[in-house]
Amino acid sequence: KEETIVTNQVRFEVKLLGATVFQVEGYSEEKYLKDQLISYNSKTLQNDKEKFVNLVFDKDRNKFDIKGSSYNGEASIDNIIGNWWSHKILQTNSQISPISGSIKQQIVTFVGKEKIDLYNKIYNVDHFTLKSKDISLPKDKRLDFDIWYDSKNFIIKKISYQRMGLWEYYL
């Protein structure tokens, strides 16, 4: 298959004692041509703040051109969009924020092989941590994730992090 399109739609809110403390609604689309990202577009409303990314691959310069709510400029094609569907996030030194377009340097560390139980099924996975390289970033801007990866099927099975409580994503 020549072209692949990945769409992502998210909408949720967190309420505490009836008051909304966090709210996100967004949509994104990634386009790949023969495994090369050629465009990424997203619009997100996060706590009433509009955020966006418009990224295109410049074939002549072999770079990404990014117009985002937090970053405008170019980026190396070694960057990966920081979405959880692609295991390539574990193989790069930096990622592009899927919400704002900012570029974040990261350190990925292999923790070990584990077995996890998801939906009453046991999976053999590799456990990694993914953290911001720049520890001077404010804590709420840092990358700090635990990731469980099924290397047999090339699928990230679970992600967890702490921010206003424990968040976990399962596939």
Predicted feature residues:
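Acidic, serine/threonine-rich low-complexity disordered tracts
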Residues: K1-F57, K88-L171
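Beta-strand/loop-rich accessory regions of lumenal/periplasmic or secreted enzymes
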Residues: S76-S94
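Hydrophobic, well-structured mid-protein blocks that either form specific transmembrane helices
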Residues: S42-G82
